Amino acid sequence: MAVTIFAAIDVGSHETSMRIYEISKKYGVHEIEYVHHTARLGLETYSTKHISYTTIDKLCNILNGFSEKMKEYDIHDYMIIATSALREADNNLIVLDQVKQRTGFLIKILSNSEQRYLCYKSLALKENSFHSLIKDGTLLVDVGGGSIQLSLYDKKTLIATQNIKSTKTFSFISIGRIVEDNPKMNKRIIYTV
């Protein structure tokens, strides 16, 4: 029976994480290890639009540690993605170059649409209840380091989606206003505190 070991690395706003999976036709996808370290790229990107050399150094050290862990499992198949913290940094090309030079890794920066697609796809694959959940009116709220994504489903169909950039003045009152301004959302949401 062929078994593939795959590593998925996420360079996020707050932390950089690696999940190692065992994949086989017989047993499907099974997570065998999860490793994460705080890097806080978003702290700099969202306040200065720039990632410092100190943070780049920390990121490279984390990724080199992940590389050692991948050697333990003899992993050759992997993907490294980054989201808004790297996407919105004005020096993201320098960061990508430094990572490539110092770790050998190529990072793919996902667009917001790609990020949300993968998030919802993973929910659909992982949770048996996902399809029954979106059968009725459902609001999915994806809170990230750089933004909040609201996605409204009804009868298993995506009706509306809205991305809200996080700012220092952002509050959940903003979500309420967006919901109230969208008749389809307003009919289907129960407000709770």
Q: Which functions belong to the PLM regions below?
A:
Residues A2, N112-T138:
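Conserved phosphate-binding catalytic cores of ATP/NTP-utilizing and phosphoryl-transfer enzymes
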Residues H14-Y53, K155-I189:
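Short glycine-rich, Thr/Ser-proximal phosphate-binding strand/loop in the N-terminal lobe
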Residues D57-K69, T192-V193:
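Short, well-ordered amphipathic alpha-helical segments that serve as non-catalytic structural scaffolds
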Residues N92-I94, Y120-S122, S151-D154:
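Short acidic, glycine/serine/threonine-rich loops at helix termini
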Residues I134, I190-V193:
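Phosphate-interacting basic helix/loop segments used at nucleotide- and nucleic-acid interfaces
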